[in-house]
UniProtKB/Swiss-Prot annotation:
This protein's name: sn-glycerol-3-phosphate import ATP-binding protein UgpC
Domain of life the protein comes from: Bacteria
Enzyme class, UniProt record, top EC level: translocase
Alphabetized Pfam families for the sequence: ABC_tran, OB_MalK
Organism: Vibrio cholerae serotype O1 (strain ATCC 39315 / El Tor Inaba N16961)
Gene behind the chain: ugpC
Amino acid sequence: MLDIKQLVKTYDNGHQAVKGVDLSIHQGEFIVLVGPSGCGKSSILRSIAGLESITSGEIHLAGRRVDNEKPANRDIAMVFQNYALYPHMSVYDNLAYGLKNRGVDKQTIAAKIAKVAKTLKIEEYLDRKPAKLSGGQRQRVAMGRAIVRDPQLFLFDEPLSNLDAALRAHMRLEIKKLQRELGVTSVYVTHDQVEAMTLADRIVVVKQGEIEQVGTPAEVYHQPASTFVASFIGSPAMNFLPASIKQGQLHIAGKHCYLPQFDAMSSENITLGIRPEHASLHPLTNAIELKLDIQVVEPLGPNQLVHGKIIGLESEQDFIAVTAEIPLDVHQTLPIWVALEQLHLFDQQGKRFVQSHRSCTQSSKVASTRQQ
């Protein structure tokens, strides 16, 4: 439906914001571009919209090349962070403005606006000016203006950034329901990984102008392609610990387990990734046990964040575990177990070691520790 081929965007100051991006988006898909500020995600979006000229590459929409066409001719509608509503116009006139410019007759405009207003539940606001609306109401009007055009493609440029946390959560749900109902292909830009995980059919993680990983929310969460993706997707961020592997034996904090899939691999410097929510306080089978020296406990209500250091590591690497809300003391030693299937291994360049299945047996030293 939308095909981006070797997209490059270099600005006049020489900064290359987008570096040869290739991306294919299917009809009706909801794609979220996510990454830190300055990673190039907004440049990709603005290039699709035609708000930025591209340096090289091609953009095809429904089989038609559009990168050499004016924005108005691309059949794309965009929703901005700042709503981009005309303050002197009523909500109705804001919704009708684009249709009037295209020469659509008044009766058709009225019918389209009535349908969109009902869908977005903004019927009672049609006579109001934007200044009389809340942030969430303005964002719904901005979405309505895009929907009423009946475009082939929706583009969302961080549309929820100006809203408070509660309203963001509500609007996320509204956008997802609306996109499912309309079935319009959508590309959404955000720096918020929660928005990415909850909204996307597929997530595109962008780093320094290049695509780091494309996958479903589950794929990006459970099989991050790199330490960058692993640290960006998931909250709290993944823990990273120094480890080594020798002929399949994984060594970490004085303990080791055998990974038969890696029996031909040896490296003195690898990174072991553990998600905070995968640290169990109860012994698990086919798991590795580590001990945490507690530094800080942050109560969150139903659970808590336990910050500390892994005992046995030479480095002073911080470690966070998400646990049930139980009484814990600073400098208490807390045993934690992590299922081997939930360990993530990365090489010295931060790239993921890929394997289809893990089956580890622990050494007697680890086993004896677990029995204490």
